[in-house]
């Protein structure tokens, strides 16, 4: 609890407040903003026809039961409502009540008589446009109402009491026959449309020209067969039990699925396309298998002098002895001049090797 709230109030509290308020200087803000808030002497307040007095109530409401009314004739002094006076522009107030022009009764009676004498077309010229709008609206409303009534009457005539008599057996059969014909026609049309649709669906599109098909699949992996080992009983003893006999059956344990591998196939529609993409080169020349003329075996060597193939050393000696006998009887061949002095051999032809100049010696 604060000290100020607990102590007793002073008797002289607020004595100097009135003096401070009188000595306070007026602020310029309230004198200049919006034209100032001070009242002018020449500004008359607006006074309406009705006095700004509070509602009069019965005197019994404000008087307690124990109090006696001081005087019934005294009336409360009306209090005027003060408003803030500014120098801003104000629109002139218009009187709510129209002014009554004091006209003599004779003139008004004469005007009424003149108006009655005028034709209807010339009366109320100022309100002609308004009356024309009213008349067009009323005419349009009347036409709309007539149309609605006509529609309702037509609907009533249509929905009137219409009693359909039951059809006879002959009429029912005739109607069923007509319905059957219509159903058959509809069924034929439907079947024809379905057949056309199936033809269009199953019609395969053919691509002109060569076709290369790429197809990749998975196939079971097949291992290459290796050398098969056989157990040979050398000493005549019983063979040792195989590993398959010692191990239990594979059916008791889990069986692993066989391994698989991928294979890719490329198919060509014709051989011409295949040869175009994979041209084949010239096949290699297969060497001619030469035979030794002495032993009639495949020749493994060739004599450089006689250019005769031979298979063994004995065949080589026989070939040389025959060559010596030939030289003794016929002399050296043309190619043998290269071994001794003599005229130079002729120039070889283009494309021919040294073997082309050698003379073939046939041993019979």
Curated annotation (Swiss-Prot):
Pfam families: YL1, YL1_C. The keyword Transcription regulation applies. The modification Phosphoserine is found at residues 127, 129. Residues 40-75 have a biased composition (Acidic residues). SMART domains: YL1_C. InterPro entries: Vps72/YL1_C, YL1_N. GO terms for biological process: chromatin remodeling; negative regulation of transcription by RNA polymerase II; positive regulation of DNA-templated transcription; positive regulation of double-strand break repair via homologous recombination; regulation of apoptotic process; regulation of cell cycle; regulation of DNA-templated transcription; regulation of double-strand break repair. Its main location: nucleus. Phosphorylation is enhanced by ZNHIT1 and promotes the interaction of VPS72 with histone H2AZ1. There is a cross-link at residue 115 (Glycyl lysine isopeptide (Lys-Gly) (interchain with G-Cter in SUMO2)). Component of the NuA4 histone acetyltransferase complex which contains the catalytic subunit KAT5/TIP60 and the subunits EP400, TRRAP/PAF400, BRD8/SMAP, EPC1, DMAP1/DNMAP1, RUVBL1/TIP49, RUVBL2, ING3, actin, ACTL6A/BAF53A, MORF4L1/MRG15, MORF4L2/MRGX, MRGBP, YEATS4/GAS41 and VPS72/YL1. Component of a NuA4-related complex which contains EP400, TRRAP/PAF400, SRCAP, BRD8/SMAP, EPC1, DMAP1/DNMAP1, RUVBL1/TIP49, RUVBL2, actin, ACTL6A/BAF53A, VPS72 and YEATS4/GAS41. Also part of a multiprotein complex which contains SRCAP and which binds to H2AZ1/H2AZ. Belongs to the VPS72/YL1 family. This is Vacuolar protein sorting-associated protein 72 homolog.
